[in-house]
A protein has these predicted regions:
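Short, solvent-exposed loop/beta-turn-alpha elements that line the ligand-binding surface or hinge
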Residues: 28-46, 92, 144-168, 242-250, ...
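Periplasmic solute-binding protein
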Residues: 17-24, 30, 49-93, 127-166, ...
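Bilobed periplasmic-binding protein-like "clamshell/Venus-flytrap" ligand-binding domains
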Residues: 109-126, 287-290, 443-454
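Extracytoplasmic "Venus flytrap"/periplasmic binding protein-like
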Residues: 1-55, 84-95, 112-115, 130-132, ...
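Structural recognition of the beta-strand scaffold that forms the well-ordered cores
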Residues: 9-13, 28, 61-65, 78-80, ...
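Conserved small-residue motifs centered on glycine
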Residues: 285-418
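Histidine-centered catalytic/metal-binding microenvironments
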Residues: 417-465
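Extracytoplasmic/periplasmic substrate-binding proteins
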Residues: 126-152, 178-347
Length: 465
């Protein structure tokens, strides 16, 4: 496409936005939005600043694909444990790694085998492929550094960027994993099993605890519920390394930017294109996209609130072609309001609301909420309003220059096997293995990568006052 210098009117670039920008393929939509985009401006509000390409070029070349004003209504937290284990602990959920360990060991001691006679597993992971970032790498940042998810990086209060797998806190966390491995709590196959093996193992109900992302382990929970093993599903936890840290699962980092829809220089009528995008951002456009057609896909109750019939909900959940046939949530890449957001007159933009999430809790979740005195499971976490709004979006989502991405890849290719070696070695070998990994990272551009990433982030900082 770039080689031929020929483009469609609009393009959802995903990871190729930088290439298109550098080729001059995307037009700056700033003036078009100012003249023809009142709904675009309303949707993004103060976060319009984050749509700007950089401080050097404040043009807007994409509208973000991610939900604006997204509310986190469910979360896996920093790690997870089976509801059965939490129930046996009188629903006193762990907040520190030490408490997490004690709960896992206590449940294993009381239940060494499954009803089928298989050995229970304390913790397992999927670390033989790219999922190592999800189950081995990311939890280290969430638990040890108490950092929000910025990919392989942590950002300090001065907006300096650091590669996370060299911090003192992560050293302590991986030393803990090493001990769990040598004590037989961590699955000996955690770094060699395939992701399919991992999914099957977790879905069997044998694994007491996991350190995973909700989107990844949710497929296991669907199987567990179908098999009548609801108590073996998982509760997300606000676990951190130390008591003085605050887990940040609910911290709102603002609209995720980096991927989105843009208008190309080949578009003969960019005014028409921006008007189309503006319509999609309107209340009418958003309700049509998320809910469908009134009287067909949804109805209004006596209070003017939308609802879907049980038949429609079942169809949406079971028909693989539902989105394609109805158009509801089918065309990804366009700007949308996030779950849990409402119009000015109180109309929920999406069917996923606080009320719908609570209504869909399984029996273990409902019993847990009642026992802990929570309305929602997210009530056990620090709430969004407790955090300051950050002047940057999630770092992993930005379109980074190729040379910067290559620097990270070099570090990751060292850290992945290095961390596995740290965990699977003996406890006496840990310090030496850790120091060896850090030295290899240092010798392969660690400081240069951190400096380059810090400089990159500096171009993305916006005023949030």
């Amino acid at each position: 496409m770039i080689a031929n210098d020929e483009y469609p009117d609009m393009i959802y670039a995903k990871g190729s936005a930088t290439d298109l920008y550098q080729a001059g393929a995307l037009i700056d939509m700033t003036d078009l939005i100012e003249k023809y985009g009142p709904n675009i401006k309303k949707m993004y509000g103060a976060e319009m600043e984050k749509l700007k390409w950089s401080q050097d070029d404040p043009g807007i070349y994409q509208l973000s694909y991610a939900g604006v004003n997204q509310k986190t209504l469910t979360t896996g937290g920093s790690c997870q444990i089976q509801w059965a284990a939490l129930k046996e602990n009188d629903y006193k959920y762990p907040k520190t790694l030490d408490e997490y360990e004690k709960m896992i060991k206590s449940y294993l001691a009381a239940h060494p085998k499954t009803e089928d006679g298989l050995d229970m597993i304390g913790i397992t992971m999927s670390a033989s492929d790219w999922h190592w970032m999800i189950t081995l790498g990311n939890p280290a940042g969430l638990i040890a550094d108490a950092s929000p998810d910025n990919g392989q990086w942590i950002i300090d209060d001065e907006y300096n960027v650091h590669y996370k797998h060299v911090t003192d806190e992560e050293k302590e966390y991986f030393k803990w994993l090493c001990r769990m491995y040598n004590e037989g709590i961590l699955d000996p196959n955690f770094a060699t099993q395939t992701d399919d093996d991992y999914i099957a193992k977790v879905a069997s109900g044998r694994v007491v605890a996991i350190t995973d992302a909700e989107w990844h382990y949710s497929q296991c929970e669907a199987t567990l519920v179908a098999d009548g093993k609801v108590d073996q599903t998982y509760v997300g936890l606000p676990v951190t390394l130390r008591e003085d840290q605050v887990e940040k699962a609910l911290l709102y980092q603002g609209t995720t930017v980096g991927w989105g829809i843009g208008i190309t220089k080949s578009c003969e009528d960019p005014v028409r294109a921006i008007k189309f995008l503006d319509y999609l951002c309107s209340d009418e456009g958003q309700i049509l996209y998320h809910w469908g057609i009134e009287g067909e896909n949804y109805f209004l109750d006596d209070d003017g609130q939308p609802y879907r019939t049980d038949e429609e909900v079942a169809k949406a959940q079971s028909d693989p072609d539902y989105a394609k046939n109805t158009g509801i949530d089918n065309y990804t890449g366009f700007p949308i309001y996030g779950t849990g957001s409402y119009s000015e007159d109180g109309f929920p933009y999406t069917p996923t609301t606080k009320e719908s999430v609570i209504a869909n809790y399984n029996t273990a979740e409902k019993e847990g909420c009642e026992a802990m005195g929570f309305e929602m499971l997210t009530d056990m976490f620090a709430q969004p309003e407790e955090f300051d709004l950050l002047p940057y979006s999630a770092l992993w989502a930005y379109q980074q220059p190729q040379e910067l991405a290559e620097k990270q890849t070099i570090l990751d290719e060292i850290a992945w096997p290095g961390l596995v070696k740290c965990v699977t070695g003996t406890e006496d070998e840990f310090d030496g293995n850790w120091e060896s990994m850090v030295q290899e990272l240092t010798d392969n551009g660690l400081a240069d990568a951190e400096e380059a990433m810090t400089e990159f982030l500096a171009t993305k900082l916006v005023d949030v006052e």
